[in-house]
Amino acid sequence: MNTNYKYIIILIFTFLNLFKTCPTYPKPIKIDQNHPLLLKAYNEIDNLIQTKMKSDNISSFIATIVYKDEIIFSKAYGKINPLDENSLNLTLNNNIRIASITKTFTSLMMFKLRDQGIINSLDDDIRDYFPQFKINSIYKDKRNEKITFRQLASHQSGLARETPCDRIDYGTNKCNDKVILSKLSKQFLISKQPNILSHYSNLGFSLLGRVLGESLKMKKTMKEQQAYEYWVTNNIFKSLGMDNTTFNYDEKVKDNMAIGLYKKSNGSFSIAPISPAGWNSPGGGIFSTANDMAKFMIFLLSDENQQQSESSFYLEETTLNELFSPMNLLRDGFSVYGIPFLHTYDTSNSIWISAKNGDLTGYHSNMAFVRPLKLGFFFSSLSDINSPDIYINSTIDILVPIYEILLNEEASKIQQIENYLIKQEIPIIPNSFLAGFYKDFHGNEFLIYNETFNGNGDHTINGNLLVNFDNSNSNLTIHTFELDKDYPYIKRISYYDETLQGCRLLAGGENEELIYFNFINNDNQQESTNFNDIKNLKVYSVQVMGLLLYKI
């Protein structure tokens, strides 16, 4: 290809991305789950799962979808034991292994203990709480010597992927605390750049859980030998009503267990072996059910979580945001490791998906969130599967467009009502007082339109005044400040249509800024905020974006 053509293509691509608008999402509100579009979508999802199960030769499968605080789709496919034709049908209350999805519970425990002051900071060296842990490093830089909670939870610790034990010894005395710590003390970190490169580590998460347990013992808030398991069980499982979720592979779980299968070399299927995870439980040892996982997802999505500060297990909104925050961008450019989720940008729907997979022999699960729309998905295949996302991405392609359509429709109805109510209110400061041309001595300009400014009709959007800042034509409007009754001279400026703007402009420009109008008394020309006598006041100046501009 001619070099000039290459440059032209690059320039066009750059230009298009420069002006690409920022995707916006409707506010998640209650919608009719019996709407024909939703019923059709749920039927499509059902057909999708059955079609893919058939093509992938999967006998048993579980799918649960939640929206805000309710289950909107939930179905079990196949038998409890697919190899037994007389087996009972699989249910949403049968136990399965969720494997590495356990890491979400361990992460939640870490944030909660930080919030409670049990651990001082996520950037503390874990050896301050667990001095028994030792590992060697070939790096002499003192900055690389410590391993922190944050590094363990974000796969940036430099630890190897797996615990230094044979898998068949998990849960036995051949792979207990003493044995593992002894082996690690003779091994080395594998990463040249801890805290920069991501290297997935089951060992790191198992160690994280054990250190969290030790921190509870150190602060004398717990005496139990298995402090990690005890805390998660009593503070998360019991608080959320996850009655069939446990670390214990006891008789109750065995009797309720859905049978996972693995394919042998000859193509036939065999029952997957199950053994306790033991020391490795924080990285993948939980047994749960679809219904219990729905409760967990609802907890992470529901607005009620932020409102019930008196509940037995409460998360601050800032902590919940940390749980869903990105940490380290991967080399593909659109996937990011977080704590504990892998965040991937779905280009077809212009939305981020936060997901955590769990894979053990015979059990392959995925828990994923489309958080802007408060949708949660838990899908589990009880045999090997060719889909890393366990069919969730295809399900999102069906569901997200429908939810956006219906939520936008509901939002439009609500907006019409709000606009009507706004028109019925008599503002403390009429729009005509604010409209006009503002300028400072450096030539900066701020123009506010109303229906009388230039005689060309009503220049308002949904009752809000239009704004032109420095001749930018940036479709800004003036909105009522939330505390308008107490501070009527304060207003908010924002874009009346955010879909027309780029993400960087929305984040770094005038959007959502507060502006402050200054009034003077007509009689004595002194500043005044006595709005009981509004007819005797006039606007003198406005403070906006760090500028003081005077009304001309």
Swiss-Prot record:
<dbReference type="GO" id="GO:0005576">
    <property type="term" value="C:extracellular region"/>
</dbReference>
<feature type="glycosylation site" description="N-linked (GlcNAc...) asparagine">
    <location>
        <position position="57"/>
    </location>
</feature>
<dbReference type="Pfam" id="PF00144">
    <property type="entry name" value="Beta-lactamase"/>
</dbReference>
<dbReference type="InterPro" id="IPR051478">
    <property type="entry name" value="Beta-lactamase-like_AB/R"/>
</dbReference>
<keyword id="KW-0325">Glycoprotein</keyword>
<feature type="glycosylation site" description="N-linked (GlcNAc...) asparagine">
    <location>
        <position position="266"/>
    </location>
</feature>
<dbReference type="InterPro" id="IPR001466">
    <property type="entry name" value="Beta-lactam-related"/>
</dbReference>
<protein>
    <recommendedName>
        <fullName>Beta-lactamase-like protein 3</fullName>
    </recommendedName>
</protein>
<feature type="glycosylation site" description="N-linked (GlcNAc...) asparagine">
    <location>
        <position position="89"/>
    </location>
</feature>
<feature type="glycosylation site" description="N-linked (GlcNAc...) asparagine">
    <location>
        <position position="393"/>
    </location>
</feature>
<feature type="glycosylation site" description="N-linked (GlcNAc...) asparagine">
    <location>
        <position position="244"/>
    </location>
</feature>
<feature type="glycosylation site" description="N-linked (GlcNAc...) asparagine">
    <location>
        <position position="450"/>
    </location>
</feature>
<keyword id="KW-0964">Secreted</keyword>
<dbReference type="InterPro" id="IPR012338">
    <property type="entry name" value="Beta-lactam/transpept-like"/>
</dbReference>
<feature type="signal peptide">
    <location>
        <begin position="1"/>
        <end position="24"/>
    </location>
</feature>
<comment type="similarity">
    <text>Belongs to the beta-lactamase family.</text>
</comment>
<keyword id="KW-0732">Signal</keyword>
<feature type="glycosylation site" description="N-linked (GlcNAc...) asparagine">
    <location>
        <position position="475"/>
    </location>
</feature>
